[in-house]
């Protein structure tokens, strides 16, 4: 099955150019034809004149209106998106519907949208008006043009990236991934459905270019960026750094790994349920997905038995996506290598999941796709060497009380997020993302400083600098 995906420029869906596209093979030999940038499309994109001259309330209300469309299971755009995820990306029906549900949740959570701005920027008003702060007035201005280099493994990361830029009133040039050319296109198309003439809609462009071909046109787009948001693996991040202008900030959301810690659980079922969720969500394609479980205490066999049950449960309520021949082969190879090494191996029907019980210092291949290594340890000290700065994103812990004991040690070792088991995909409002408060990198804080006759806490006289120099009285005013 072939599908043509046009680009969107300044909120307008472009006619598909039969002379400028790249054909990409996706799941089960299904193919898509992706429009690629041309001299004409780049010129149109860079001639954008519209700015998001709206207050935060208007922005949030527009996003909420779009979200209400996504909330309806009868919305045609939502139904098409679910079908595309299943047909072309190999998602199970449950996984695809959950993805659409999460898009609705992100757009409709008005309180969370306000709180994201409040906690990252310090106030929900700083984008709209000058606020008194110390001896100044301060206002946050959008950087301008935000270029989003999206990854294909976690569709919601692209949605999050775009929403952050919209909340901070930045225009968006969105470069989709060939492994998920659908999500950004569907989101921006839903903006068009609601109001094609809305300033937010008209500030959106969605396009594609290959990384391994002539960079002349893509370099023009990158040169136009005021801020770059890069998602993906090492090569994607290196590309972003290489082709971004030297003066712009690059928000790098690169490859990370995550793990779970289970300490002497009284409720074995709850512990195993949380770990199973953290393994199964996105089939371990996300940075926050658990790949290793460290079990502190006794009764490991009981935990493993329950983890089997919970993984079987998730195989029913959230079936994994389809795997290619190579992915299935990697899964089988990991199983055989682990058995040859003498490790305990448990597996689900039809490669639904894989558990390998191994020592902490022995790591085999990681085929992902719901495969996990379980290591029994006696103390947190045995786990700390595997928590690495800039590489370990999320540590999920059960019971929650154990996280209070270990969070300082984990933080010093470099972890970026600590959550309760079963919560790795929920990024709580107010938290950091990969050690950053991302919205701060999407704005310029402008300060309007008070005049000379404004007295400060430490200097209760007018700041007459010329007079102080003439009379050599500077030290008189030093507190």
From Swiss-Prot:
Pathway recorded for this protein: Lipid metabolism; fatty acid reduction for biolumincescence
Pfam families registered for this protein in UniProt: LuxC (PF05893)
Reaction(s) catalysed (UniProt annotation): a long-chain fatty aldehyde + NADP(+) + CoA = a long-chain fatty acyl-CoA + NADPH + H(+)
SUPFAM superfamilies registered for this protein in UniProt: ALDH-like
UniProt KW keywords: Luminescence, NADP, Oxidoreductase
Enzyme Commission number, as recorded: 1.2.1.50
Family note: Belongs to the LuxC family.
Protein name as catalogued: Long-chain acyl-protein thioester reductase
Organism expressing this protein natively: Aliivibrio fischeri (Vibrio fischeri)
């Amino acid at each position: 099955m072939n599908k043509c995906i046009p680009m969107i420029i300044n909120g307008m869906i472009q006619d598909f150019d039969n002379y400028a596209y790249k054909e990409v093979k996706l799941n089960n030999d299904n193919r898509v034809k992706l429009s690629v940038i041309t001299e004409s499309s780049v010129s149109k994109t860079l001639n954008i004149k519209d700015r998001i001259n709206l207050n935060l309330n208007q922005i949030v209300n527009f996003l909420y209106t779009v979200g209400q469309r996504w909330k309806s299971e009868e919305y045609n755009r939502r139904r098409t998106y679910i079908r595309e995820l299943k047909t072309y990306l190999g998602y199970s029906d449950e996984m695809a519907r959950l993805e659409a549900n999460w898009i609705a949740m992100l757009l409709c959570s008005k309180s969370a949208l306000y709180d994201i701005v409040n906690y990252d920027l310090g106030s929900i008003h700083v984008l709209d008006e000058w606020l008194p702060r110390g001896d100044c007035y301060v206002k946050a201005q959008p950087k301008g043009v935000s270029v989003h280099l999206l990854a294909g493994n976690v569709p919601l990361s692209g949605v999050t990236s775009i929403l952050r830029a919209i909340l901070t009133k930045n225009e968006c040039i969105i470069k989709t991934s060939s492994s998920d050319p659908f999500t950004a296109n569907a989101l921006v198309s839903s903006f068009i459905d609601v109001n094609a003439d809305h300033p937010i809609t008209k500030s959106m462009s969605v396009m594609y270019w290959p990384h391994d071909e002539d960079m002349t046109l893509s370099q023009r787009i990158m040169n136009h960026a005021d801020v770059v948001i890069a998602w993906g693996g090492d090569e994607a991040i290196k590309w972003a750094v290489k082709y971004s202008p030297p003066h712009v900030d690059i928000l790098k959301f690169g490859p990370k790994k995550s793990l779970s810690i289970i300490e002497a659980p009284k409720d074995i079922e709850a512990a195993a349920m949380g770990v199973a969720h953290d393994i199964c969500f996105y089939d371990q394609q996300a940075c926050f997905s658990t790949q290793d479980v460290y079990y502190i205490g006794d009764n490991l066999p009981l935990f493993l038995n329950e983890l089997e049950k919970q993984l079987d449960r998730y195989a029913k309520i959230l079936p994994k996506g389809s795997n290619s021949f190579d992915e299935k082969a990697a899964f089988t190879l990991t199983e055989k290598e682990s058995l040859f090494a003498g490790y305990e191996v448990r597996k689900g029907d039809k490669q639904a999941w894989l558990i390998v019980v191994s020592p902490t210092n022995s790591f085999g291949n990681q085929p992902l796709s719901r495969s996990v290594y379980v290591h029994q340890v006696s103390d947190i000290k045995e786990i700390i060497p595997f928590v690495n700065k800039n590489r370990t994103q999320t540590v999920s812990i059960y019971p929650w009380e154990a996280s209070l004991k270990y969070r300082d040690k984990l933080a010093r070792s470099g972890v970026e997020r600590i959550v309760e088991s079963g919560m790795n995909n929920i990024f709580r409002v107010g938290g950091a993302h990969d050690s950053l408060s991302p919205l701060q990198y999407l704005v310029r804080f402008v300060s309007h400083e008070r005049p000379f006759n404004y007295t400060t806490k430490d200097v209760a006289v007018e700041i007459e600098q010329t007079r102080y120099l003439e009379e050599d009285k500077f030290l008189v005013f030093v507190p």
